[in-house]
Curated annotation (Swiss-Prot):
It comes from Caenorhabditis elegans. This is Embryonic developmental protein tofu-6. One of its GO terms (biological process) is positive regulation of chromosome segregation. CDD domains: RRM_SF. Residues 13-92 form the RRM domain. Disruption phenotype: Worms whose mothers are lacking mel-47 exhibit prolonged interphase between the two and four cell stages of development. Mutants arrest as early embryos ranging from 50 to 80 cells with no signs of morphogenesis. Chromatin bridges which connect nuclei remain present after cytokinesis appears complete. RNAi-mediated knockdown results in maternal effect lethal (Mel phenotype). RNAi-mediated knockdown results in chromosome segregation and cell division defects in early embryos. RNAi-mediated knockdown results in defective activity of the PIWI-interacting RNA (piRNA) silencing pathway. Component of the pid-1 and tost-1 variants of the PETISCO complexes, which have roles in the biogenesis of a class of 21 nucleotide PIWI-interacting RNAs (piRNAs) that possess a uracil residue at the 5'-end (also called 21U-RNAs) and embryogenesis, respectively. Promotes the biogenesis of 21U-RNAs. Mediates the interaction between the PETISCO complex and the PUCH complex, the endoribonuclease complex processing the 5'-end of precursor piRNAs, thereby enhancing mature piRNA production. Required for chromosome segregation and cell division in early embryos. May have a role in DNA replication. Coiled coil: none annotated. Expression is restricted to the germline (at protein level).
Amino acid sequence: MASSSTAYYLKDAGFHIRNIPKAWNDWNLFHVFQNFGKVSYCRVVGQSNDGQVQLGFVNMMSVADADEVRKNLNDGNLIGENFTLKVTDHKNVGGSLLPMASNSVQKLVSSPPSKSGPVLLSSSWLPLNKDIEVEVVDYLPSSSVAPDLFALTLLRINDSSMKEKYDSMHEKMNAYAQIVPFDSELEIGYDGVFRDAPRSVRRVRRISATKLYLVDFGKIINYEKAKCFQLPKVFQSMPTRVSLCGLDGLTWSPVAIPSFDNIREVVKKWGQMENSTLHAMACGFQGSINMINLFCGKSILADRLQRKGVCEYLPRSQQPHYAYSRETLLQHNNSGVTAQISNDADVVKDLLKKIDGVKNMLRELEL
């Protein structure tokens, strides 16, 4: 959508909607009208006199797009699934509504975005025990990563359904960004939106005073306050497209830990050196981290690292497993009740990890 100053006054392309449901916002209205063509501008501007419905304005990108809307009007009503909108065509009223509309819209567009608490998008979970094609991208730092855990940031590739979902989100964000003011301070460690081109915006996390991370593309860019604004709630529900991952079954030599950054750079180029696509398989979870096996053809990264002598590798099939009864888990997880399961601190710690793992797997199944 273009800004109201250039698009809203397009002759014969505007509509006034008089009975927008109270639960609707700009995007509900946008979704209705985009079915007929390109929407230049749309806004829910306030309640009607009786307070039961809202008023709104829509301007299409061209007269041809507006004519498509007109073809679908039935006696001034736009009828859809579970709604009927009363639409006044500006073409038929000689523009008498435009001064009122422009004042309301201009006031809203020039108003600063509402202040809310800092936003932090959730990391993307990988499907359990499923072979997926991935790319190792720029590392996204996380406070949940232990100093001795080698972590990577992965981006799923060749996944048409996921690409379609995120492409749709970015299309909506690009339309929204044409009508909101930028220049908003992002706190370090939190997420917002960055304009990387005149008609293109991206979700970002501020990772330092000077750097931003594109959380759906896996790239680090420079921070520019004048190109940032707060992340609207409608775009907060989707997790980052990148996934925080750790290599499963590795115990690192203390002398290798300071070299993690260098090792990550080598792993990023691993697929190119092997002339093949990297594949990952999540075999478990450690808190918010996907624990994975990473391989390229018949070459397994953990094996290669072990042969370099920088770590020890124990495949998951050989790792110790602990089993607990359903009753014990329920008793331990019951609010306000501590189960007497063991005096061994390591066993208790392991049980807590298992509970976290179960919760994460349930979350994955819901997706």
